[in-house]
Swiss-Prot record:
The keyword Transcription does not apply. Residues 405-603 form the DUF724 domain. Residues 269-308, 327-350 are annotated as: Disordered. Residues 520-575 form a coiled coil. It holds the Pfam family Agenet. CDD domains: Tudor_Agenet_AtDUF_rpt1_3, Tudor_Agenet_AtDUF_rpt2_4. It comes from Arabidopsis thaliana (Mouse-ear cress). This is DUF724 domain-containing protein 2.
Amino acid sequence: MEQMIFIRKDDKVEVFSEEEELKGSYYRAILEDNPTKSGHNKLKVRYLTQLNEHRLAPLTEFVDQRFIRPVPSEDVNDGVVFVEGLMVDAYLKDGWWTGVVVKTMEDEKFLVYFDCPPDIIQFEKKKLRVHLDWTGFKWIRPDNKELVKSVFSCGTMVELRFDCAWIPVIVIKELEKDKRFLVKYWNKSYSCRESKNLIVDSLRLRPMQPPLSVGKYELLDHVEAFSGFEWRQGVVRGIVFEGRYMVSFGATKEASQFNHSDIRPPMEWEDGVWHKRTKPKRQKETSLDGNRNVQTKEPPGNEMADDVKKESGLPITLGVTATKNKTQGKVSPVPMKNGFGNESTREKMPEEPKIKYYTRKRKRGGLKLNSYINKTVLSSDRTPNVVKNSASNAEENHAKHTIMVLPFAKKSPVWKTYESLEVFKSVSHSLHFSPLFETKQDFREGYAIGMMVTYFGLLEKFKDLEADVPVSQLNSLKDSFSELEKHGFNVTTPLSRIDKLLALKDRQLYIMEELKGFDKEMTNEFSKAKQEFDDMEQKILEVKHKIIELQRQEAALKEQKEAEKEQKDAAWKKICQMESCAKDLNVELEDVEFEFETILSAPW
């Protein structure tokens, strides 16, 4: 038989709040009046977690008896499985709020929906308890709620379109009119408790994009990157290391670095189905020297490089700028940004198969390849030795000619291997190795190859750095990159990052000094507090000893009092006996006097 529960004065209770902002919540209190049998009178309670308007003492008020209930048992969750639809009480703002579990998360966390006001908040299991209704003398557990599941049902993670980005949000509830939804911003790194609620149209919402397994992204791939709590459309501009990419957004050429896990391919949600985003259309086609087609487009992924591979037979994308010679009607090669051209300077190009180059149209005179392709490296079985720069025509900044001569001939096959690496092609180099003119001819190519090996080794060494790297090692790396820069290596990015790391190390050193100061101060404060605590403990101990002594004296006095009381009782008893004897003597004395008078008054 279920045991009935009754509450009495001085019991801990929970009080239901009717205030608009606190409606639906229970707060702990001490009952300061005994309940009445009728249940109509208001009872005085003293809250344990709420203060009065002056915030100096616990809040006390008179509450209807029907809003007061006992405190549920501590083991109320024993044997209860937390599932979607379970009614629970969540500990929030110093009280227990009634809600419904709408979604189970990882690590024993749950999303709880509250009806008044409408909201969804994430809680750990230790902050939840199963909801029970109080009948007046016993607890009753209500049935689980039946949740209706849909694409945009309560507790569903969706994405909200904002300008050109998609922001993760969570659906709180569907409003009755106009197919609108109440949502709030959502991020798995925090509980979204303080997020602002928004009312949005259903056309701006879509489900969370399903995860796609992408091995790696290539240069110029159109992607979406997670930046500032939103998915933004961008283009891969560089591959830093395996699993890390440089992505730019919009018209700007500035790129930011992202992990592979923070990048996804763009997709579109149409008619309840996910589709891959269609490729950008070709815009315009022109002719270059009658034999070469130039097309304007923004190619997705590495489609541009694949077209060149298929039609020209070259292993990688060409990285030259093609210009039209106005006087001769011929095409002359312009050197790439890394300083490599063809084997020798040529005034006329030999007959070649028709090749398509993807490019943008120039504002004045001539056409050039897409600037993004210029960052790639020309692969050839024959290594260049002399490079000639040529401007397109007199209409463009006047014609200038510069000749760059390498101090050696590239004979080793390792050049092709190094120059084809993505980490080398992703940055524009102007390798000239001019300091090698001061060395012997036989050693120059070996020195240059050694510098290539050193360059890649330094990049790997930089990648493997850890937070506790000494400043001397960073300075050594900086000096090594600076030495490579003298030979034409583009080390702007590594040097910039090393400078940032050095600045961070200075900041780290400053913070460590601050921490040492704080540690010393905390140690002193702790020692001071410990001494004060020990002194207080000693005083308490002394007071306890005094209390014990006083208690001993009190006990002795009580014993003495009892003894004196016994003596007093004995004395009183003796006095009573003496009074009785005195009375008897007085009677006897009166008898003597009476007899004396009788004798005197007797007749003769």
